Amino acid sequence: MRDFDFSFNHKACEGCGAKCCVGESGYIFVTIQEMQQISAFLKLELEEFSQKYVKKVGYKFSLLEKDAKDLGLACVFLDLETKKCQIYSARPKQCQTFPFWESVKTFSKEQKEAFCQSCPGITQKTKETKVR
């Protein structure tokens, strides 16, 4: 992505252990359309899916988290044994676009360094390699 000062190697995901899906509490925001897509993928009615897997956060919706023992919290759809997403083909846009989130552009230097260190697929660009 051109507007970011880091690059991402998606092949690193294969052996990473789903670090982007575990850790501190956070939100995995989903739209109504994404909830419909995921519920259809799971062969659930939207209402049942919403009651079982979604919480309201202000005026938005977020997927629930579950206890991942020593790892902290995890997305409710992360299989903790295989470290694979159970809804990968229907996953929300927030997951599809990781790590290229607009909010990352506003991170402090320290936040950006921690973010980049949290994922083995992220490499910060040096001044010489930044795309203009």
UniProtKB/Swiss-Prot annotation:
It holds the Pfam family CxxCxxCC. InterPro entries: Puta_zinc/iron-chelating_dom. To M.jannaschii MJ0661. PANTHER family: PUTATIVE-RELATED, YKGJ FAMILY CYSTEINE CLUSTER PROTEIN. This is Uncharacterized protein jhp_0259. It comes from Helicobacter pylori (strain J99 / ATCC 700824).
